[in-house]
From Swiss-Prot:
<comment type="similarity">
    <text>Belongs to the NAD(P)-dependent epimerase/dehydratase family.</text>
</comment>
<feature type="transmembrane region" description="Helical">
    <location>
        <begin position="91"/>
        <end position="111"/>
    </location>
</feature>
<dbReference type="InterPro" id="IPR001509">
    <property type="entry name" value="Epimerase_deHydtase"/>
</dbReference>
<keyword id="KW-0119">Carbohydrate metabolism</keyword>
<comment type="subunit">
    <text>Homodimer.</text>
</comment>
<keyword id="KW-0812">Transmembrane</keyword>
<comment type="function">
    <text>Involved in the synthesis of the negatively charged monosaccharide that forms the backbone of pectic cell wall components.</text>
</comment>
<dbReference type="GO" id="GO:0032580">
    <property type="term" value="C:Golgi cisterna membrane"/>
</dbReference>
<keyword id="KW-0333">Golgi apparatus</keyword>
<feature type="active site" description="Proton acceptor">
    <location>
        <position position="243"/>
    </location>
</feature>
<keyword id="KW-0413">Isomerase</keyword>
<keyword id="KW-0520">NAD</keyword>
<dbReference type="GO" id="GO:0050378">
    <property type="term" value="F:UDP-glucuronate 4-epimerase activity"/>
</dbReference>
<dbReference type="Pfam" id="PF01370">
    <property type="entry name" value="Epimerase"/>
</dbReference>
<keyword id="KW-0472">Membrane</keyword>
<protein>
    <recommendedName>
        <fullName>UDP-glucuronate 4-epimerase 2</fullName>
        <ecNumber>5.1.3.6</ecNumber>
    </recommendedName>
</protein>
<dbReference type="InterPro" id="IPR036291">
    <property type="entry name" value="NAD(P)-bd_dom_sf"/>
</dbReference>
Length: 434
């Protein structure tokens, strides 16, 4: 029986047995209590619906990411310590947030291969296919990387991780990605990219010793900037999307924690990362899927039929940049939340320096897949996309020898080979691209 079943739908009638003022007062009081209880239940019911029931057409991933996770206990702590244990003399111990993500998986694997201690953290939200994230998790587990299932907004979990392991570095790659999705679910971007980042920095600044932090910003911070190539000193005060605005906010927040608490912080502005184990919401990925299925693909063009181009950067080059930034990151200067001196604060572009028209990307995919694409040319919508990106990487080259080496033709060939091997059609693996 529902707890509301004992509340009558109508007041009904009853016969007064006692006309005394005391009795009248008592019955009025009881009636008031009943009404109060009823409306309280209605009020809390509405609160429940509002906060815990999101519309089907607009799922709130920020709420989903706060679901209850199971962590803690001796066995769990043993796995955490084992994964984070340094295997080489000069190795470091790194907490990688967003470890089940595209870049996070590749970076975690690379760190582990060279003998560093690596512990992953990911909330496995369903912004895109979670089975792909689970496959990445299985891949990392085979190499000895344990991914803690939890959220960066869980302060207790973060504090526990730093109690169990004195991390020397944090590679912060957890974020709500995607430019267009921000128009559907803006709260998830504030929740993950701003609140989550602040939460992580709060724990890091109180740690003893404080870790050095390398984190993923984005090339989207350049927004409506028209000066090319994009350089780190160019203006970034014209974001074209909420996603870009949250990443720009992250850079300002990083400056604040560096200035007040002495945290060593390095931001990396990624330029259109692609490759095996990529994100299904990226154009090269869903173009491949739709071309194979015979579906039409929408290709955007700029004003007056202008070219839309991207500085596509292969994942292996991005990983080299991440490790280079990590290896040259200086120690934080604070301790227990108190600054002891000036700390390092940097930001770098990680791109390929060779913008390629999206139409050329489609042509390459057609050759690799041996399928002609059904092209649908469309005007670039005002949803946060920009007509071009182009990275100036001279700062990263100078600081840690960053030098991308994979052209788009080579990188897409590797991606297509992985895609055809990973996804099956009719229960059989599709033949690999030539």
């Amino acid at each position: 029986m529902s707890h509301l079943d004992d509340i009558p739908s109508t007041p009904g009638k009853f016969k007064m047995m006692d006309k005394s003022p005391f009795f009248l007062h008592r019955t009025r009081w009881q009636s008031s209590v009943a009404k109060l209880a009823f409306w309280s239940l209605v009020f809390f019911g509405l609160l429940f619906i509002f906060f815990y029931r999101s519309p089907i057409s607009n799922p709130d991933s920020s709420r989903r990411s706060l679901r209850t996770y199971s962590w803690g206990g001796p066995a769990w702590e043993k796995r955490v310590r084992s994964s984070a244990r340094v295997r080489t003399r000069n190795g470091v111990s790194v907490l990688v947030t967003g470890a089940a993500g595209f870049v996070g998986t590749h970076v975690s694997a690379a760190l582990k291969r060279r003998g560093d201690g690596v512990l992953g953290l990911d909330n496995f939200n369903d912004y895109y296919d979670t089975s792909l994230k689970r496959s990445r998790q299985a891949l990392l587990e085979r190499s000895g990387v344990f991914i803690v299932e939890g959220d960066i907004n869980d302060l207790s979990l973060l504090k526990k991780l730093f109690e169990v392991v004195p991390f020397t570095h944090v590679m912060h790659l957890a974020a709500q990605a995607g430019v267009r999705y921000a128009m559907e679910n803006p709260g998830s971007y504030v929740h993950s990219n701003i609140a989550g980042f602040v939460n992580l920095l709060e724990v890091c600044k109180s740690a003893n010793p404080q870790p050095a932090i390398v984190w993923a910003s984005s090339s989207s911070v350049y927004g409506l900037n028209t000066k090319v190539p994009f350089s780190e000193k160019d203006r970034t005060d014209q974001p074209a999307s909420l996603y870009a605005a949250t990443k720009k906010a992250g850079e300002e927040i990083a400056h604040t924690y560096n200035h007040i608490y002495g945290l060593s912080l390095t931001g990396l502005r990624f330029f259109t990362v692609y490759g095996p184990w990529g994100r299904p919401d990226m154009a090269y990925f869903f173009f491949t899927r739709d071309i194979l299925k015979g579906k039409a693909i929408s290709i955007f063009e700029g004003a007056n039929h202008g070219t839309v181009a991207r500085d596509f950067t292969y994942i292996d080059d991005i990983v080299k940049g991440c490790l280079g930034a990590l290896d040259t990151a200086e120690k934080s200067t604070g301790s227990g939340g108190k600054k002891r001196g000036a700390a390092q604060l940097r930001v770098f572009n990680l791109g390929n320096t060779s913008p390629v028209p999206v139409t050329d990307l489609v042509s390459i995919l057609e050759r690799l897949l041996k399928v002609k694409a059904k092209r649908n040319m469309m005007k670039l919508p005002r949803n946060g996309d920009v007509p071009f990106t182009h990275a100036n990487i001279s700062s990263a080259q100078r600081e840690f020898g960053y030098k991308p080496s994979t052209d788009l033709q080579t990188g897409l060939k590797k991606f297509v080979r992985w895609y055809l091997g990973y996804y099956k059609q009719g229960g059989k693996k599709v033949a690999a691209a030539a």
